[in-house]
Amino acid sequence: DYISQLVPILDRTFARGGNVVIPSFAVGRTQELLYFIRQIKEERMLKNYNDFPVYVDSPLAVEATNVFCDSYSDFDDEAASLIENGINPIAFPNLYVSVTSEESKAINSDPAPKVIISASGMCEAGRIRHHLKHNLWRPECTILFVG
């Protein structure tokens, strides 16, 4: 169960004042993470940090998320039920997307604990390298590989 594993990681990292940086594939995995994070926030599983910001930092992931949102007919029963009740299964308060490189760079200037989901699941190129440069050396931060 992804959520039961994700909650303590978020809780420990935020308690230390750190960021959770998640290298993720832009299509599929990013949207799955947003689905789980929405549930964590909605059910208030992080009692002291429920309003944490989440940044999706990848133009391709942003586009894929938009396509995903337009494909409601392809959702499973659980997601379809959420939609029928007026809930977007991958949207929530404090979700931010960055498209430009300036927006991407600004993410690391915010000292508040946050989740950064950035494309390039293998960390070989792209914006994730910028986020690793700013967070990898910080012991309070967590780099979370989600496959």
Language model features: what each stretch is:
Residues 1-147:
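Acidic/His-rich, metal-assisted hydrolase cores and their charged scaffolds
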